[in-house]
């Protein structure tokens, strides 16, 4: 991530660059855990934040779902997850074949179907809200991402669960 944004934020001294993997961090009773996600960039991590019995889980740049990701998203009150592309839009869209294969590959991104299936696998009574993010402008629409997840929730009798699409403007503050 730093390599991508360093031109915008300037140089950060090496002593201030700390990539902490597989370590729990506690800040004012908030427990922050990280977990590796499969992506073609270096050191991509997902995070869980736990405070006073509440849990928020965040995962983006997820090439494929594995048990580590599932275990970390389980028992969440809120999940923030990428829903990057619609398979049909990707395959018929403007990207060249190499990039299409990269996006849908094991080190690429989650499709709407894959993100929705993952949410279906980690559903629990605690889960109140799902934020869908990192939605491709070329290969997806917010409506397709939303509808894909809504179909899974409806099938599981969880259609009351809140779904929100995150765009560049961000979101309102959500209290768990």
Over which residues does each language-model region extend?
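Cap/insert and terminal regions of metallo-dependent hydrolase folds
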Residues: 67-165
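Core dinuclear metal-dependent hydrolase active-site scaffold
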Residues: 20-78, 174-176
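Cofactor-binding loop segments of dinucleotide-utilizing enzymes, especially the Rossmann-like FAD-
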Residues: 61, 135, 168
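Alpha-helix N-cap/helix-start and coil->helix boundary motif
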Residues: 2, 86, 170-171
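Active-site HxH/HxHxD metal-binding segment of metal-dependent hydrolases
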Residues: 1-24
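Beta-strand->loop->alpha-helix junctions that form or flank phosphate-binding loops
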Residues: 16-20, 158-169
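Short active-site-adjacent helix-start/loop capping segments
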Residues: 3-6, 140, 173-174
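A generic structural signal for alpha->beta connector loops
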Residues: 13-16, 29, 127, 160-162
């Amino acid at each position: 991530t730093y390599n991508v944004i360093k031109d915008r934020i300037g140089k950060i001294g090496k002593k201030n660059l700390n990539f902490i993997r597989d370590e729990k961090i506690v800040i004012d009773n908030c427990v922050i855990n990280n977990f590796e996600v499969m992506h073609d960039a270096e050191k991509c991590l997902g995070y869980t934040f736990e405070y006073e019995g509440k849990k928020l889980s965040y995962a983006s740049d997820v090439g494929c779902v594995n048990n580590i990701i599932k275990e970390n998203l389980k028992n969440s009150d809120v999940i923030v997850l990428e829903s990057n592309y619609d398979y049909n839009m990707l395959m018929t869209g403007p990207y060249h074949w190499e990039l299409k294969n990269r996006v849908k590959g094991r080190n690429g991104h989650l499709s709407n179907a894959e993100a929705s299936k993952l949410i279906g696998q980690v559903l629990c009574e605690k889960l109140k809200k799902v934020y869908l993010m990192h939605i491709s402008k070329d290969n997806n629409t917010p409506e397709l991402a939303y509808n894909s997840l809504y179909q899974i929730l409806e099938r599981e009798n969880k259609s009351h669960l809140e779904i929100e699409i995150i765009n560049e403007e961000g979101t309102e503050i959500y209290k768990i």
